[in-house]
Amino acid sequence: MKYWVRMNKEELQIALLLMKETELTGVLKVDPDFEPEKSKIDEMIRKKFLKQEDSKVSWNPFVKMIVWSVTHAQSVLKINIPNKALRHIYFYDEIMILLSKDHEEDIYTFYFVPVLPEAIGGLANTLEELKEIIPEKGKAEAKKIPILSEKEKELELTEIISEINDIDVVAEHFEPIVVNSDIFGKHDVQNVVVKMQEIFWWVERKDENVFFYPVEFYELMEFTAKKIVRMHGASIAFKRKGMNV
């Protein structure tokens, strides 16, 4: 099966209207004067968004789930990275949808990522692979902070990060995000991802030192999405609960 839906601006407006929505937050507002031609809707019915069964027209359930999820997202992460197509990440229930937009044309692509517990549960143990996406420049810029106190030696990595006082070495503010042992289940996780001063860092504990490696956020999200899909595939794609569409 496909894990994405691609549409142009007009198709997206029609899809929103069919869902009785007039806005995709931060991305597109349907023009109040927009009245799609019947031929355009028929084209969508025939080719892309709707399917014909027993002489009845109904939504393609995958497309409906995508549009429903982005218009009813419980949280939205906005991305503003120059020269990158990724614009928004939507979270609804147990799924994540990445939205990219072509720079030259009004082409929107929604990538579906199942973030069910069984999908993300095993991902924490594969974070070592993040080293593969850290460029040599990032490895050279790694920050090393020694664990000095006996108290810190007994703490979990996320607790150690909270105890770090040498803020000049790393940053003035940080917060756990995307990948940590709380989100990814109960695992013996020795690395996390944190955000500090608008930079994302992969944090690793080695013996009595903590290392911070800068990670490019777009590549981080792409890695995470591909890993989930590759690990679990179509078998979990439609295990939906609590979504009345």
Task: Place the predicted regions along the sequence by residue.
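Non-catalytic recognition/regulatory regions in large multidomain proteins
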Residues: 51, 57-245
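Short, amphipathic alpha-helical interface elements at domain boundaries
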Residues: 1-45, 49-66
